[in-house]
Amino acid sequence: MAVYTDIHPNDLKVFLTRYAIGSLLSYQGIEEGIENSNFMLETTQGRFILTLYEKRISKDDLPFFCRLMQHLGQRGIPCPQPIIQNDGVMIGELAGRPAAIITFLEGEWIRQPDIDHCGEVGTGLAQLHLAGQDFTLSRKNTLSIMDWQVLWQRCQITEDALLKEFGQKIESELAFLQENWPFNLPTGIIHADLFNDNVFFVNHCLSGMIDFYFACNDFFSYDLAICLNAWCFEPDYSYNLIKARKLLENYQKIRPLIPLELDKIVLLARGASLRFLLTRLYDWFNTPPDSFVIKKNPWEYWHKLCFFSNVNSLSELGF
């Protein structure tokens, strides 16, 4: 979450008259994140989240995201629920941007997750994958392997010494992944961005999963590989086998991986590292300087990519 577009209080008050959520008491921009402009709303009926969808999010995809959250919520997945306007509309417009209000989830995201947090994530991810199997809408992953080359080319427009230093490794990794990427793994709805700032906990129990705006149809095991990247490294970039083992064990208690998924999981983890390295690089050089956003360190994913590139066995991942 983040703030790119500011809103005028009077415009917000008019916008809220379309909803049955009470009168506005206060609102505040939410700093975390990089995709959309988000605000915490406090009304006479409680707290809500207002999202203004910025240009990276296609307006045509918004019904998919909102319907998916409804679908998952109906199946017991703790995720935000869109608030419907009085006339039945789900997506409105505010400050020249598509806008929606969603429910507020209790809990906090964990900056230094422990083993139990990782286990909860493994369980929650598997439950999400199963809950999405009967979702009737679909969305292509617009940040999959076929999109990474274009993203890398856009990063190279910037004259940066580090990009030049590591460019050859990135290009060789792109070529390797494109040549070896699988196309026949179990597929369905994935979150595709289940980082620690998108998962809430209350007393070590997972209480919510948020930010479904990268959700799409792709390999379940790719989503799991993203979580290995996001949850199983320490601040010094060392891979924590105990955390990984707990995450993987809990996931497989609910949705066991088939042999072909196990065969490709290291490759998928390499791909996930490269995907987040490239998107963070792009955002690092292209985020407007006046935006209310904390940019994320792209080189964290350089270290993770190097780790996964040197993994030779499943036991090194935690299986």
Curated annotation (Swiss-Prot):
Q: Which InterPro entries match?
A: Aminoglycoside_PTrfase, Homoserine_kinase_II, Kinase-like_dom_sf, Pseudomonas-type_ThrB
Q: Indicate the segments annotated as coiled coil, or none if absent.
A: none
What Gene3D superfamilies does the annotation carry?
3.90.1200.10, Phosphorylase Kinase, domain 1
Signal peptide (residue range)? none
Which pathway does this chain act in?
Amino-acid biosynthesis; L-threonine biosynthesis; L-threonine from L-aspartate: step 4/5
Documented EC number(s): 2.7.1.39
Q: Which NCBIfam families match?
A: PRK05231.1, thrB_alt
Q: What is this protein called?
A: Homoserine kinase
Originating species: Bartonella tribocorum (strain CIP 105476 / IBS 506)
Q: What is the lineage of its organism?
A: Bacteria, Pseudomonadati, Pseudomonadota, Alphaproteobacteria, Hyphomicrobiales
- Per UniProt, what is the name of the gene that codes for the protein in this document? thrB
